[in-house]
Amino acid sequence: MTSFASLGITEPILTALTDYGYAEPTVIQEKAIPAGIAGRDVLGSAQTGTGKTCAFGVPILQRLAQGGRGRTIRALILTPTRELAIQIDENLHAYGKNLPLTEAVIFGGVGQAPQVDQLKRGVDILTATPCLLYT
């Protein structure tokens, strides 16, 4: 049985995953996380509820935490719906709660001023719907 620690995940993220209730990685996580941490491209497919957000999110968080900080967007995640964008942002926030990274989510149908202000302050990870990102 594989553990999250055996996948090369750093302690701050391991602690957050444990706090979030994750005990052991799913198949998609076991295959994608080490490849993502190593900087390789990953194309994965898995059923709903198998932890795909963790599978791609943990490597993003770990690689960004190991690099320097800046005021520019360092990772961009595009999603087709606002609900999925919010869910991904909430999960990344939970997984990265012990890291000095910031994340934001932007989508249409709400006032843009708070979203623009957040981007001006600097964001490491941006999750967005394509339509609003374009505007």
Q: What are these regions, as identified by a protein language model?
A:
Residues 30, 55-56, 76:
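Hydrophobic alpha-helical transmembrane segments of integral membrane proteins
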Residues 7, 16, 20, 35-36, ...:
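Amphipathic alpha-helical segments that mediate coupling or scaffolding at interfaces
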Residues 1-45:
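Conserved pre-motif I regulatory segment
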Residues 26, 48-50, 81, 129:
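Conserved phosphate-coupling serine/threonine residues in phosphotransfer and NTP-handling enzymes
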Residues 34-38, 54-69, 93:
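Walker A/P-loop NTP-binding motif
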Residues 41-56:
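Walker A/P-loop
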Residues 70-132:
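Conserved nucleic-acid-binding Ia/Ib motif block in the N-terminal RecA-like helicase ATPase lobe
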